[in-house]
Structures are given as structure tokens and as C-alpha cells.
């Protein structure tokens, strides 16, 4: 399915972009009986890979919105010019770095143009893949570590919604996700999500207008945690969570 992300991304106004869905048989009945689980998984993951920005560019899909770059810094959090993380911002048709002041224009067909100097990444997806490679390198070299105080909320049920529990401390590194602290009612909260159990992380940008959130779940409960001091960290969590998972699994 291509086109959907261009329509619903957290930007306004809404865009009228064609959506195209292709149905593909990944494996026949006979292949399912013969192939290993690993090979079937590989085929599924391969079939689910797609690049909306390249699709837009190659098919000349025009997005004329004057706000087409709004919030794109949520994805493009690292500056390719100075290497600074979490100082990117965006408005209108531009994305820019608040640290070194490098700036790029996003044209109507999804191509990026540096306002000064050479354009290192022509497409948003190329920039995104570079960020992922940088995050993986950081994990592999043992340099990755994150910590911050977070507001934790417990999802009670669909009728009641979320209940605020208090402020605790969160760390994320080769030990996995660790949440620890004293809740507002005086009880101690401690939860660990080891790397080998966490292949991916569900993130929510500005969840219900209450801030960026991570969805932490067990078989019994669901909590949303909101980092209090770090900004625009969510996309990097996607990369580092996956990288830490594979690094840990390969060691076992």
C-alpha cells in the first residue's frame, strides 16, 4: 500500500494523494509446507518493505501544500551537515537545523534541496536510512545510552482510559528498557524489558496532545511513558531498539 503515509502523516492540511494497493502471493501452499520459518519470515519482511518518498518522486506525485514539510523533523532528527541530533525543526516547506542553521527545501515532488552547498540526501528516505545506519553504529560500538525522567500513565481500559501514576526514571541501553521509581501513591514501580524480548517499540508522536510517548506493554498491563526533558527522541528509539535486539540475539 503506497500513498497512505503521504495522506495521514501528522501534518496539516490533509493532502489528496492517490493510494495504490498491490496484492502479492508471498508463498504458495506447497512452499509453505516446504520452506523454513526463517525463509518465510524473510519473504514477509521483504514484501512489506516500501519507500513512499521514492514512489512519490519516481511517479511525479505532486503535493502542493504550503505545509508539506511540517513535522518532517520528527523523522529527520539528525543533521547531516553538523551531525547534531534532536536540533532539527521544520515549518512550511523547509526543514532546518537549529544548531548549524543548515536548511533544506522540500519541493512538490518530494525532493530535498539544500539552500546552501551540496544536497547530501535527495530524498527523505535516504536521510532516514542514514540516520538508521548511524544509530546502529552507535549501538554496535557500545556508545548508545539514554536516560530521562518520564511521566508514566497506566491504561486501565477503553472506558476509563489512562490514569497518571507519577514520575519515574527510564534508561535504555544494552541492558534494555528499565523503568524505576516511586509513584505518587508511594508504591515502588520497577519494570525491565530486556533487549532480547524487545524487537521493536511502539511510539506515538504527541499522543493525544499530551507529549511524545512510548507504549510499554506486558501480557497483563499497558503503560504509556512520556520523556520529560529529552526532545524528539522517538524515531531514534525505533532504530536503537531493533539494533540492540539483533546485537543481543547474535550473542546468544
Indicate where each model-derived feature is located.
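A broadly conserved sequence feature marking short terminus-proximal activation segments
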Residues: 18-85, 223-227
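Structural motif
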Residues: 94, 101-103, 174-178, 222-223
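Short, small-residue-biased leader/transition segments that mark boundaries at the very start
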Residues: 1-7
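Anionic N-terminal interaction surfaces
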Residues: 112-170
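Cys/His-rich short segments
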Residues: 61-118
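Acidic, Ser/Thr- and proline-rich intrinsically disordered linker/docking segments
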Residues: 194-252
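Short, surface-exposed beta-strand/loop "edge" segments at domain boundaries and coil↔beta transitions
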Residues: 103, 160-163, 184-190, 219-233
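Phosphoinositide-binding peripheral membrane targeting modules
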Residues: 157-211
